[in-house]
Protein backbone atom coordinates (compact mmCIF):
# COMPACT_ATOMS: atom_id res chain seq x y z
CA UNK A 1 0.00 0.00 0.00
CA UNK A 2 2.75 2.47 0.94
CA UNK A 3 4.50 1.84 -2.37
CA UNK A 4 1.31 2.79 -4.22
CA UNK A 5 0.96 5.96 -2.16
CA UNK A 6 4.63 6.87 -2.75
CA UNK A 7 4.23 6.41 -6.51
CA UNK A 8 1.09 8.54 -6.42
CA UNK A 9 2.90 11.32 -4.54
CA UNK A 10 5.77 11.31 -7.06
CA UNK A 11 3.32 11.54 -9.97
CA UNK A 12 1.33 14.34 -8.32
CA UNK A 13 4.46 16.33 -7.50
CA UNK A 14 5.69 15.91 -11.07
CA UNK A 15 2.39 17.20 -12.42
CA UNK A 16 2.22 20.12 -10.00
CA UNK A 17 5.74 21.55 -10.38
CA UNK A 18 5.00 23.30 -13.72
CA UNK A 19 1.78 24.77 -12.29
CA UNK A 20 3.55 26.15 -9.23
CA UNK A 21 6.22 27.69 -11.46
CA UNK A 22 3.43 29.61 -13.25
CA UNK A 23 2.50 31.11 -9.86
CA UNK A 24 -1.05 29.86 -10.02
CA UNK A 25 -1.17 27.94 -6.77
CA UNK A 26 -4.94 27.49 -6.97
CA UNK A 27 -4.46 25.27 -10.02
CA UNK A 28 -2.03 23.15 -8.00
CA UNK A 29 -4.58 22.82 -5.20
CA UNK A 30 -7.32 21.95 -7.70
CA UNK A 31 -5.17 19.31 -9.40
CA UNK A 32 -4.04 17.96 -6.04
CA UNK A 33 -7.61 17.69 -4.76
CA UNK A 34 -8.84 16.05 -7.94
CA UNK A 35 -5.83 13.73 -8.00
CA UNK A 36 -6.46 12.65 -4.42
CA UNK A 37 -10.11 11.98 -5.25
CA UNK A 38 -9.08 9.58 -8.01
CA UNK A 39 -6.28 8.15 -5.86
CA UNK A 40 -8.76 7.43 -3.07
CA UNK A 41 -11.09 5.67 -5.47
CA UNK A 42 -8.40 3.63 -7.22
CA UNK A 43 -6.45 2.71 -4.08
CA UNK A 44 -9.59 1.65 -2.23
CA UNK A 45 -10.63 -0.53 -5.16
CA UNK A 46 -7.14 -1.86 -5.91
CA UNK A 47 -6.20 -2.56 -2.31
CA UNK A 48 -9.71 -3.76 -1.42
CA UNK A 49 -9.95 -1.39 1.53
CA UNK A 50 -13.75 -1.39 1.60
CA UNK A 51 -15.32 -1.61 5.02
CA UNK A 52 -12.27 -1.61 7.28
CA UNK A 53 -14.05 0.79 9.67
CA UNK A 54 -17.59 -0.40 9.02
CA UNK A 55 -19.90 -1.81 6.40
CA UNK A 56 -23.16 0.07 6.74
CA UNK A 57 -25.20 -0.53 3.62
CA UNK A 58 -27.41 2.59 3.82
CA UNK A 59 -24.28 4.79 3.98
CA UNK A 60 -22.95 3.01 0.91
CA UNK A 61 -26.23 3.62 -0.93
CA UNK A 62 -26.17 7.30 0.10
CA UNK A 63 -22.64 7.52 -1.27
CA UNK A 64 -23.69 6.14 -4.64
CA UNK A 65 -26.68 8.51 -4.71
CA UNK A 66 -24.37 11.49 -4.03
CA UNK A 67 -22.44 10.73 -7.22
CA UNK A 68 -25.49 11.93 -9.22
CA UNK A 69 -25.50 15.59 -8.06
CA UNK A 70 -21.69 15.54 -8.13
CA UNK A 71 -21.71 14.49 -11.78
CA UNK A 72 -24.40 17.05 -12.63
CA UNK A 73 -22.32 19.85 -11.07
CA UNK A 74 -19.12 18.77 -12.82
CA UNK A 75 -20.71 18.36 -16.26
CA UNK A 76 -22.66 21.63 -15.91
CA UNK A 77 -19.43 23.43 -15.00
CA UNK A 78 -17.58 22.00 -17.99
CA UNK A 79 -20.39 23.11 -20.31
CA UNK A 80 -20.44 26.60 -18.76
CA UNK A 81 -16.71 27.34 -18.68
CA UNK A 82 -15.97 26.58 -22.32
CA UNK A 83 -16.94 30.20 -22.99
CA UNK A 84 -13.74 31.39 -21.31
CA UNK A 85 -15.24 34.62 -19.99
CA UNK A 86 -16.97 35.40 -16.72
CA UNK A 87 -20.04 33.16 -16.83
CA UNK A 88 -23.01 34.15 -14.68
CA UNK A 89 -25.68 31.92 -16.20
CA UNK A 90 -26.71 28.30 -15.82
CA UNK A 91 -25.13 26.52 -12.87
CA UNK A 92 -22.81 29.50 -12.36
CA UNK A 93 -25.73 31.63 -11.17
CA UNK A 94 -26.27 29.19 -8.29
CA UNK A 95 -22.71 28.41 -7.21
CA UNK A 96 -19.36 30.00 -8.18
CA UNK A 97 -17.27 26.83 -8.28
CA UNK A 98 -19.52 23.94 -9.33
CA UNK A 99 -16.66 21.75 -10.56
CA UNK A 100 -14.80 21.95 -7.25
CA UNK A 101 -18.04 21.44 -5.33
CA UNK A 102 -18.98 18.44 -7.48
CA UNK A 103 -15.57 16.85 -6.96
CA UNK A 104 -15.77 17.52 -3.21
CA UNK A 105 -19.22 15.89 -3.05
CA UNK A 106 -17.85 12.90 -4.98
CA UNK A 107 -14.90 12.68 -2.56
CA UNK A 108 -17.32 12.69 0.38
CA UNK A 109 -19.36 10.01 -1.41
CA UNK A 110 -16.22 7.84 -1.57
CA UNK A 111 -16.02 7.95 2.23
CA UNK A 112 -19.59 6.67 2.44
CA UNK A 113 -19.12 4.02 -0.24
CA UNK A 114 -15.80 2.57 0.94
CA UNK A 115 -16.05 3.26 4.69
CA UNK A 116 -12.29 2.91 5.06
CA UNK A 117 -9.55 4.85 6.83
CA UNK A 118 -7.81 5.40 3.50
CA UNK A 119 -10.91 6.96 1.91
CA UNK A 120 -11.41 9.24 4.91
CA UNK A 121 -7.82 10.53 4.92
CA UNK A 122 -7.49 11.04 1.16
CA UNK A 123 -10.99 12.45 0.68
CA UNK A 124 -10.74 14.93 3.56
CA UNK A 125 -7.42 16.20 2.20
CA UNK A 126 -8.94 16.38 -1.31
CA UNK A 127 -11.92 18.39 -0.05
CA UNK A 128 -9.63 20.79 1.84
CA UNK A 129 -7.47 21.30 -1.27
CA UNK A 130 -10.53 21.95 -3.42
CA UNK A 131 -11.85 24.49 -0.90
CA UNK A 132 -8.49 26.30 -0.90
CA UNK A 133 -8.41 26.20 -4.70
CA UNK A 134 -11.84 27.83 -4.90
CA UNK A 135 -10.77 30.59 -2.51
CA UNK A 136 -7.55 31.24 -4.46
CA UNK A 137 -9.36 31.14 -7.78
CA UNK A 138 -11.70 33.85 -6.46
CA UNK A 139 -8.64 36.05 -5.85
CA UNK A 140 -7.36 35.31 -9.35
CA UNK A 141 -10.75 36.11 -10.88
CA UNK A 142 -10.96 39.41 -8.99
CA UNK A 143 -7.62 40.35 -10.59
CA UNK A 144 -8.81 39.18 -14.00
CA UNK A 145 -12.39 40.51 -14.05
CA UNK A 146 -12.29 43.27 -11.40
CA UNK A 147 -15.48 44.78 -10.02
CA UNK A 148 -17.78 42.58 -12.08
CA UNK A 149 -16.37 39.52 -10.29
CA UNK A 150 -16.62 41.22 -6.90
CA UNK A 151 -20.32 41.82 -7.59
CA UNK A 152 -20.68 38.20 -8.74
CA UNK A 153 -19.03 37.06 -5.47
CA UNK A 154 -21.48 39.16 -3.50
CA UNK A 155 -24.48 37.60 -5.25
CA UNK A 156 -23.43 33.98 -5.75
CA UNK A 157 -22.10 31.70 -2.99
CA UNK A 158 -18.83 29.81 -3.40
CA UNK A 159 -20.26 26.34 -2.61
CA UNK A 160 -23.60 26.82 -0.82
CA UNK A 161 -26.11 25.70 -3.45
CA UNK A 162 -28.97 25.88 -0.94
CA UNK A 163 -28.67 29.66 -0.58
CA UNK A 164 -30.13 30.19 -4.06
CA UNK A 165 -32.75 27.45 -3.76
CA UNK A 166 -34.86 29.22 -1.13
Please provide the spans of the model-predicted regions:
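Membrane-anchoring alpha-helices and their flanking helix-loop junctions
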Residues: 1-88, 105-166
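Membrane-interface loop-to-helix entry segments
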Residues: 93-105
Amino acid sequence: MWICIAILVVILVGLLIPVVKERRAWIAYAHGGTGLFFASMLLNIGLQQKGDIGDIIWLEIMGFVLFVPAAILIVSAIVAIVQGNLVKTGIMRIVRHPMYLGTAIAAFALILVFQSKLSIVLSVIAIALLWMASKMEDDYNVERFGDSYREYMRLVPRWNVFKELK
